[in-house]
A protein has these predicted regions:
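Short, glycine/acidic-enriched loop or turn micro-motifs at the edges of active sites
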Residues: 130, 153, 181, 197, ...
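Conserved SAM-binding motif I beta-strand of class I
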Residues: 145-150
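S-adenosylmethionine
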Residues: 185-253, 260-264
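Conserved SAM-binding loop of SAM-dependent methyltransferases across substrates and taxa
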Residues: 132-144
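S-adenosyl-L-methionine
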Residues: 2-123, 152-186
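Conserved class I S-adenosyl-L-methionine
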Residues: 121-131
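Core SAM-dependent methyltransferase catalytic element
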Residues: 255-275
Length: 275
């Protein structure tokens, strides 16, 4: 058996989902440990390699050390597993641009967020920086009225096409322009923002202040709720200090067999009229 210790797990992270059911909390906050068979220990090391949450890199220690052949085999299995990922759009004919292919919120997750918004009493959503429309479609399919703002004309055309493909074009108003400039003109109970992270976002420290237009929208929300999709590595400590109990941070795991233990993003909710 190998003792596996993982340090740096945030308090808001469901550790059993991330690490597995055999892990127990250690004496220090964020520390977890388990006694695992060699293959299971190698699998955990492979899955967590290079990951960071809340602005801090995870530290994984395995004693006694794993053999090189076992490590290589586990990493090969993990690479194959990553190919089975939660799909973006599931209907044939959806349109993307290059950014949309890797930044699109999976369809199942976007629809869950839409239904959650309905349960919160939200009626109207402003999707500020809608991209190719994944989140807008999730809200619209849940029955909400959506204003989708995007500054890239090609991307906005993709979003409009995808809304038509899913039969919700009549629930979405599409606006070409700057999200910050148009935010306060949008009739909405909820601001939603999925800022561009960059395809190779830094895994150990991303400040929300660097995720434009999110900081500006926080100032402009004027009592509205603000939800955001941010990278798992985002350090939200300054927001936690500022917003206190009105801030909820929820890690979002994949829904497919290959990514069900992988955090796809953080769903950040700043309470307002739609708390």
């Amino acid at each position: 058996m190998h003792r596996v210790e993982v340090d740096g797990v945030p308090t808001w992270m469901p550790a059993a989902r991330l690490l597995g059911p055999d892990f127990e909390a250690g004496s220090s906050p964020g520390c977890w440990h388990a006694a695992l068979a060699p293959r299971d220990a190698a699998d955990v090391e492979a899955r967590l390699r290079g990951l960071g949450f809340g602005g801090r890199a995870l530290e994984v220690r395995v004693t006694p050390p794993l053999g090189r052949a076992l490590v290589r085999a586990a990493r090969a299995v993990d690479a194959r597993r990553r190919r089975d990922t939660t799909p973006g759009f599931t209907r044939a004919g959806a349109r993307f641009d290059a950014e949309g292919r890797w930044s699109l919120t999976p369809e199942a997750i976007a629809l869950e967020w839409g239904r959650f918004a309905v349960g919160c009493g939200v009626k109207r959503v402003a999707d500020l920086g809608c991209g190719v429309g994944g989140n807008s479609l999730g809200f619209a399919r849940a029955g909400l009225s959506v204003v989708a703002v995007e500054r890239d004309a090609e991307r906005l055309a993709c979003a409009r096409h995808n809304a038509r493909l899913y039969g919700v074009e009549d629930r979405i108003t599409f606006l070409l322009g700057d999200a910050v400039a148009l935010a306060t003109t949008c009739p909405a109970d909820l601001f939603f923002c999925d800022p561009p992270w960059g395809e190779h976002w830094h895994r150990t420290a991303v400040s929300p202040e660097a995720l434009s237009p999110l900081p500006a929208l926080l100032e402009l929300r004027a009592g509205r709720a603000l939800w955001a999709k941010v990278p798992p590595s985002a350090d939200l400590s300054t927001w936690s200090e500022r917003l206190g109990a009105s801030l909820t941070i929820e890690p979002v795991f994949g829904r497919a067999a290959g990514d069900q233990q992988r955090v796809k993003c953080l769903w950040v909710r700043c309470a307002g009229a739609a708390a």
